[in-house]
Regions:
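Conserved phosphate-donor/acceptor-positioning beta-strand/loop module used by diverse small-molecule
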Residues: 96-121
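PAPS-dependent sulfotransferase catalytic domain
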Residues: 61-75, 117-197, 254
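PAPS-dependent sulfotransferases, especially Golgi type II membrane carbohydrate sulfotransferases
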Residues: 1-4, 145-152, 156-160, 164-173, ...
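Short beta-strand segments
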Residues: 6-8, 82-85, 107-109, 177-179
Length: 267
């Protein structure tokens, strides 16, 4: 199996990208998997916090870490390419490059104001529930939810930090930043760029017949619809439910739109 990764920012098209890639019979791709957490647990288990681990050398560590991937995807041998999805992979890029020399990451990105707007719409659509994404806090407000999302330990703040780490690191050439707007408005052109970047043969996708849902995962987060993908790819314009000053402040966090990113491809 050849491993590639989907990472980047939440609410930015990773579920849509995975649904499209799944149409290709030579590809396996799903929404966020537990593999990154298993990887982190293995790293912790191999740490020298445990004295007996001094017996491990780097070659053994690499085999153990690669073994997690091979074991997890053992029943996907019919696929040639596996795409694992997790926000954590951007911050793990140096290790992934060492484990899988040909690996690449497609980083889904979106203007940050619209990401927070998307989360807020999910919250407002379920007024009788408390979401794990917001810490099950019954006293929160819109501004508090935005601050929680974009904080260092928030689902968005953590992803932004990992993305910045990857694009300014030594393996930036392994990254493709895929804008949500490009994927939703021009899916055929976007997928052509994705396949070219990954050095994979092109595939004729059906952009009007998608399948994508992760109801059990979303239910566990008390956030129904979090990973739902519409049947037809398309961009739906809307007004933001965020106050204008908050929206504009969040928009400034989209550093890839304003800062030079040498070596990084953006679509």
């Amino acid at each position: 199996l050849d491993y590639h990764f989907i990472s980047g920012l939440p609410r930015s098209g990773s579920s849509l990208l995975a649904a499209l890639l799944r149409q290709n019979p030579r590809v396996h791709a799903e929404v966020t998997s537990p593999l990154a957490r298993l990887y982190a647990a293995m790293l912790m288990g191999m740490s020298e916090e445990y004295p007996s681990n001094v017996q491990l050398d780097d070659a053994q560590r690499a085999r153990l870490l690669r073994g997690i991937f091979d074991a997890f995807y053992q029943d996907r041998q019919q696929a040639q390419w596996v795409f694992d999805t997790n926000r954590a992979w951007c911050s793990r890029l140096p290790a992934l490059a060492a484990l899988f020399p040909d690996t690449r990451i497609v980083c889904c990105v979106r203007e940050v104001g619209w990401i927070v707007d998307s989360f807020e719409r999910l919250a407002q659509a379920q007024p009788l529930r408390l979401s794990a994404l917001f810490g099950y806090d019954p006293e929160d407000s819109l501004s508090m939810r935005a601050d929680l999302l974009t904080g260092a330990r928030g689902v968005l703040g953590y992803a932004l930090d990992g993305l910045r780490q990857a694009v300014y690191g030594d393996h930036a050439e392994r990254l493709l930043l895929l804008r949500y707007e490009t994927l939703a408005r021009h899916p055929a052109q976007a997928m052509e760029q994705v396949y070219a970047f990954l050095q994979m043969p092109a595939f004729a996708h059906d952009y009007a017949n998608l399948e994508g849902d992760a109801a059990r995962f979303d239910a566990a987060l008390q956030t129904p619809g979090l990973h739902r993908v519409r049947r037809t790819v398309g961009y739906v314009p809307r007004r933001s439910v965020l106050p204008p000053e908050l929206f504009e402040r969040l928009q400034q966090l989209a550093f890839w739109e304003t800062e030079p990113l040498p070596g990084v491809r953006i679509v």
